[in-house]
Amino acid sequence: MLRRKIETQLEAWRSAPKRTALLVTGARQIGKTYIIRHFAQQHYDHIAELNFIENPDLVALFDRPRDAKNLLMRLELAVNTPLVPGKTLIFFDEVQRCKEMVTAIKFLVDDGRFDYALSGSLLGVELEDIRSVPVGYLTELDMYPLDFQEFCWSQHIGNDVFDMLAECFAKHQEVDEFIHQRLMELYSKYLVIGGMPAVVDSFVANGSVADVRTIQENIKREYRRDISQYARKEDRLHIRAIYDLVPSELNNPNKRFTFAKIEKNMRFQSVASDFDWLVNADVAVAAYNVDEPCTPLEMSKERNLFKLFYNDVGLLTGSFLKKTALDVLDGNPDINYGSIYENAVAQELRAHGFDLYYYNSKKLGELDFLIQDRNDHVLPIEVKSGKSYKRHRAMDNVLAHPEYHLNTGYVLGPCNVSVEGNVTYLPVYMAGMFHNE
């Protein structure tokens, strides 16, 4: 079994003094159903699972129930599991197919006899009202593909290594060179394998890159099917075109999405909701341009200027030629890792709670990422994939600008930890050391 960080959050939810229903959100194929089942097997005597896609007739259970007692009677007739108060988890899966759950969950929680877990895909587009459940009734946990640390766990790398990395990050100390080289090798693997559980499981089992790429293509095919099934009919072609264009757009020099690639003379206003669909479905990650790199970043966001990434770097690398994937796996220094590195960093920062922005100025240059930490400090980040990682004109210009008051910049690249002036250089695998959860 793959070890996941969300397990700690599930433990905290169960031990909280005030009971709430649990909602685990995230893209399809990231392991939501598996992790809830595994958690339930460890902590409950009985698990009642209702899947609204496998059994669509179950939606009728929630057709105007009078109260919790009436609904629980219906549930007991629908499942083959005894509902024992205090010892049963009732798990509603694929809840995007049962919008009535929004009204039902409040009185089920008030009843108090059982614990409830909800999960599903595309909740951001299909079940927006789920987040309108009154405060105190629902605990929402976001789940993502495996980050680099979780991937390393699958490769038998323990917490002691990451404790050491956290110390090096905090104290700006070099990582032991042997450990650094080993982690860079693992990071090259991660760039190809990514963090989709089925892909990682396959790689752990047989090490076959061919099998990895087949599973990755199947996942992307499933995402395309979701577009055909859940998006509005008039939007489907554009949404699919946008999704399929991500790899080529990230290979452009500025990586910014060009609307004319979707359709000649296309304007943002015509497809704004199509980009939102992909982001809200958790299959894409957006970084928005800002007018200036100052807090609060959200206030100067330009919605029509953005970079779009896949939710998993393995899906991106799997879109390129097999030779490219093998070159990445081998750490070939002659290829351009730019888009792959940047997608991996975007994915990592998003999984650690950050909204993503970037800054582009004709005069000052472009910063790959801007994030805002818990203290509302803006942190500029450049991602470099080659030996020239110490060349960063935009970073230097922005840090020197008297109106921006930025004290420190970070460069993530194929390097060890070092500090020169107000720029901190970090190995790219340290992107996960930034936290905003």
Task: Place the predicted regions along the sequence by residue.
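Pre-Walker A adenine-sensing motif
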Residues: 1-16
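Hydrophobic anchor at the beta1->P-loop junction of P-loop NTPases
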Residues: 24
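Conserved lysine of the Walker
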Residues: 32
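Hydrophobic positions on the alpha1 helix immediately C-terminal to the Walker A/P-loop
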Residues: 35, 39
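Short glycine-rich substrate-engagement loop in P-loop NTPases that contacts/grips substrate
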Residues: 54-86
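Interdomain motor-coupling "hinge/lid" segment immediately C-terminal to the ATP-binding subdomain
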Residues: 128-251
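Accessory nucleic acid-recognition modules appended to NTPase machines
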Residues: 201-375
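Domain-level recognition of nuclease-like catalytic cores that cleave nucleotide substrates
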Residues: 414-437
